[in-house]
């Protein structure tokens, strides 16, 4: 293995086609992202078949662009990393098959990467991970608290018992009447409202780090339905603020409690919802008050991208994790199954 390790990484788990060249797990030489938001906006959400077709159309040119932007060739690449799951199976297979083709044609190791592990390692691209740490994972499909003793060590200490936080945001956004993608729209609207609606904060058991957002989601939907039935005025900004404050209060409260209990050196935030301005502000304030070292990636690294897959892929490569040409994609994958004890 050369002193400088270059990873070509591919991410296609949902509605972004992305290819990145990462040096030594931390330096981004290129990170090309093709977004499909405009294509899915008219449907009000991601349509799996449409997503897969866009990946097929864009994957080859995205690979070429990533290599050209990094001023490198496949001969310089040490390994090919690709998202194995979780995600939309058709979308995943486009990236996996492209990665297999490159690995086979150029005789490079093939590295399977868990999508959420990638989100965790997005932090490492801007600020070194400091173990032990707690990772708050917040996305459209995941809400988890993960304890990490060291690189590639994942222990889930809390998770949602029903809806993921991003799922709740999207449903509330649609009920308010906001366009896709709903999460950022709610966040932007919440900045202009007041916490005037009494929505529940679901804490569950006293010592539990688990989450539940289905009750809150239903409370918001029912409140809006009842107000509309009565013909009463709805302050949409206040609804957004009240909903977001309910979400953020629970997320921050449980996360800070976990950090104290596990005596960690760092709190990192991972996933698309990590770009939420309200969450970032509340976490920053809480961590400052409790003397907790906080790391949240830049918004461009919170959403799906291949740079994060390359960062995680580098450490998997160093640990000797590779796959053969039988590599498959999966809708659901437990991050603990990807844990490597060093």
From Swiss-Prot:
Q: Which residues are substrate-binding?
A: 137-141, 170, 183, 187, 276
Q: What is this enzyme's catalytic activity, as reactions?
A: L-threonylcarbamoyladenylate + adenosine(37) in tRNA = N(6)-L-threonylcarbamoyladenosine(37) in tRNA + AMP + H(+)
Starting at the broadest rank, the lineage of the source organism is: Bacteria, Bacillati, Bacillota, Bacilli, Bacillales
Q: Which GO terms describe its cellular component?
A: cytoplasm
Q: PANTHER family per the record?
A: TRNA N6-ADENOSINE THREONYLCARBAMOYLTRANSFERASE (PTHR11735), TRNA N6-ADENOSINE THREONYLCARBAMOYLTRANSFERASE, MITOCHONDRIAL (PTHR11735:SF6)
Where does this protein hold Fe cation? 115, 119, 304
Name it. tRNA N6-adenosine threonylcarbamoyltransferase
Show the coiled coil region(s).
none
Provide this UniProt record's keywords sorted from A to Z.
Acyltransferase, Cytoplasm, Iron, Metal-binding, Transferase, tRNA processing
Q: List the PROSITE patterns hit by this protein, alphabetically.
A: GLYCOPROTEASE (PS01016)
**In its keyword annotation, does this UniProt entry include Metal-binding?**
yes
Major localization listed first in the record, in broad terms: cytoplasm
> What family is reported?
Belongs to the KAE1 / TsaD family.
Q: Which GO terms describe its biological process?
A: tRNA threonylcarbamoyladenosine modification
Q: What is its EC number?
A: 2.3.1.234
CDD domains in UniProt: ASKHA_NBD_TsaD_bac
Q: What does this protein do?
A: Required for the formation of a threonylcarbamoyl group on adenosine at position 37 (t(6)A37) in tRNAs that read codons beginning with adenine. Is involved in the transfer of the threonylcarbamoyl moiety of threonylcarbamoyl-AMP (TC-AMP) to the N6 group of A37, together with TsaE and TsaB. TsaD likely plays a direct catalytic role in this reaction.
Give a GO molecular function annotation for the protein: iron ion binding
């Amino acid at each position: 293995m050369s002193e400088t390790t270059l990873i070509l990484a591919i991410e296609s788990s949902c509605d972004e086609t992305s290819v990145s060249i990462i040096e030594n797990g931390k330096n981004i030489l290129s990170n090309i992202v093709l977004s499909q938001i405009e294509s899915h906006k008219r449907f009000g959400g991601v349509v799996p078949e449409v997503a897969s077709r866009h990946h097929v159309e864009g994957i080859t040119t995205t690979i070429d662009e990533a290599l050209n932007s990094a001023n490198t060739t496949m001969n310089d690449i040490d390994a090919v990393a690709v998202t194995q799951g979780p995600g939309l199976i058709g979308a995943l297979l486009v990236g996996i098959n492209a990665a297999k083709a490159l690995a086979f044609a150029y005789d490079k190791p093939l590295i399977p990467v868990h999508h959420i592990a990638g989100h965790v390692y997005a932090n490492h691209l801007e600020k070194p991970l400091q173990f032990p740490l707690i990772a708050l994972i917040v996305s459209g499909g995941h809400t988890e608290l993960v304890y990490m003793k060291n690189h590639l060590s994942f222990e889930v200490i809390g998770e949602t018992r029903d809806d993921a936080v991003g799922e709740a945001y999207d449903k509330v956004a649609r009920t308010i009447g906001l366009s896709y993608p709903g999460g950022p729209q709610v966040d932007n609207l919440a900045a202009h409202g007041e916490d005037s609606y009494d929505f529940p904060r679901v804490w569950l058991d006293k010592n539990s780090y688990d989450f539940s957002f289905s009750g809150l989601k239903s409370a918001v939907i029912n409140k809006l339905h009842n107000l509309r039935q009565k013909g009463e005025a709805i302050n949409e900004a206040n609804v957004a603020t009240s909903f977001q404050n309910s979400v953020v209060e629970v997320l921050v409260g449980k996360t800070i409690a976990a950090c104290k209990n596990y005596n960690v050196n760092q709190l990192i935030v991972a996933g698309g919802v990590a770009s939420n301005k309200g969450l970032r502000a509340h976490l920053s304030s809480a961590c400052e008050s409790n003397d907790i070292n906080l790391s949240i990636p830049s918004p461009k690294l919170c959403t799906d991208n291949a740079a994060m897959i390359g960062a995680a892929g580098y450490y998997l490569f160093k640990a000797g994790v590779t796959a053969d040409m039988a590599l498959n994609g999966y809708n659901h994958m437990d991050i603990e199954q990807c844990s490597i004890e060093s």
